[in-house]
Amino acid sequence: MRVKHKKWADPLIAAHPELMIDDATQFKGKWQSRFAKEQPLHLEVGMGKGQFIIGMAKDHPEINFIGLEIQRTVAAIALKKALEEDLPNLQLICGDGEDLQEYFEDGEVAKMYLNFSDPWPKKRHAKRRLTYKTFLATYQQILQDQGAIELKTDNMGLFEFSLESMNNYGMIFDGVWLDLHHSEENEHNVETEYEQKFAAKGQPIYKLIANFK
């Protein structure tokens, strides 16, 4: 969902280069220098307003997290939230998920998260889905060997497409859940804003974890 651009967003992003990067290409291969200490690097593509990535950074101080968001106002909202926390293991990027190879070196990322991505339901838009084969090829490059992807969605169509696309690509599934919130996997689940909304309506949340051979 597109959010109307707010005038305060750009000045806020510009005022906090220590936390949000506007030109991620300058740190390609050097992301560990942005953190207090060198640790495994996890990336969320499409962080939205930041609830998930901030929650993960709080729960896992032993991991360095990066959240990426293309919409500047949405990214600025996430930045506002992150500024309220003291998280030396969190960095944010205002950037495009299609440019990941320009942002990260091969094998620089240990794990990726795709949460409630745009399902692009029309068949002619299949190539825009973040689990289309061309995106998977990019993820395979920036991820370490056997690097994992975690995906959550409320959209069964996108979930089925992702399962098929990943299977056809030769990925291995470590877990598939058709009702996350009523499974043991939910015990340590960190929710997104969308996830809370959909779950409150009783909609099942689908999740998968897959890795490259």
UniProtKB/Swiss-Prot annotation:
Keywords from the UniProt entry: Methyltransferase, S-adenosyl-L-methionine, Transferase, tRNA processing
InterPro entries named in the record: SAM-dependent_MTases_sf (IPR029063), tRNA_(Gua-N-7)_MeTrfase_Trmb (IPR003358), tRNA_methyltr_TrmB_bact (IPR055361)
Listed GO MF terms: tRNA (guanine(46)-N7)-methyltransferase activity
Annotated S-adenosyl-L-methionine binding sites: E44, E69, D96, D118
CDD domains in the cross-refs: AdoMet_MTases
Domain of life according to the entry: Bacteria
Binding site for substrate: K122, D154, T192, E193, Y194, E195
Matching Gene3D superfamilies: Vaccinia Virus protein VP39 (3.40.50.150)
Disulfide bonds: none
Keyword hit for Methyltransferase: yes
Active site: D118
GO cellular component, one term: tRNA methyltransferase complex
Coiled-coil blocks: none
Reaction equation(s) it catalyzes: guanosine(46) in tRNA + S-adenosyl-L-methionine = N(7)-methylguanosine(46) in tRNA + S-adenosyl-L-homocysteine
Pathway, per record: tRNA modification; N(7)-methylguanine-tRNA biosynthesis
HAMAP family membership: tRNA_methyltr_TrmB
Record-linked NCBIfam families: PRK00121.2-2, tRNA (guanosine(46)-N7)-methyltransferase TrmB
Known role: Catalyzes the formation of N(7)-methylguanine at position 46 (m7G46) in tRNA.
Family assignment from sequence similarity: Belongs to the class I-like SAM-binding methyltransferase superfamily. TrmB family.
Protein name: tRNA (guanine-N(7)-)-methyltransferase
